[in-house]
Amino acid sequence: MQGCSRYAELHCTTNFSFLQGGSHPEELVSQAASLGYAALAITDRVSLSGVVRAHAAAKEVGIHLVIGAVVEPIDAAPLVLWATNKKGYQNLCRLLTSGLLKQGCSKKSKEIDESDVRDHDPRCLLTADEVADHTDGLL
């Protein structure tokens, strides 16, 4: 099978997204590499739990890993967010943690407002609406 060397899957959930993703992060990275993907984004639901395993697997097979998450603001539709650099990763961790602290660690709902997302530096944290203008930062 011919690989898709310029293709990057930018929204992929692992088995850490309960009832949404079924594969282990390592399996997803391995499959993406075997298909010849340029990159793979792990975007679990309100969690970065699959990122460490995915990072180790991506390093092993030589595929670029994009770190992200799906957040569910209480006043807006779900958003896919990607970290474009180390600061973006820190922002994403902070955003997810603040949602947990507001809610009290319930996995059912996170108390993240759309304004919480907007408060972060857009050069570090991208939403799906912004990705077309910033793909160089991701890939």
Map each language-model feature to its residues.
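Phosphodiester-processing cores and adjacent nucleic acid-binding clamps
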Residues: 1-139
